[in-house]
Amino acid sequence: PSDAPNIARVVALKAGIPKEVPAYTVARNCNSGMDAIIEAWRHIQLDEGEVYIAGGVESMSTIPYIVRGARWGLKLRHAQFTDALWEALTDPICGQLMG
């Protein structure tokens, strides 16, 4: 699933890559695929391995709504849904959309 906590590990294991092979996920809003490719290139330049698999799985249109406090129960309180995409793209300093 594209929302797996460590999607790189999930993809590697499902592709038959042995569990002993390292994998890590680059988490960025829009450019994680490009960042993953750059990271692979850096490792190749440093001669830290022979083969790298890099890619991206952004799916910003499927980012969920969140309800703060729901994990521990809201106890007859008003639940407010927050659009996680809108929140992620809003600059916390000036309140304007980034991108």
Which ranges hold each PLM region?
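Extracytoplasmic "Venus flytrap"
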Residues: 1
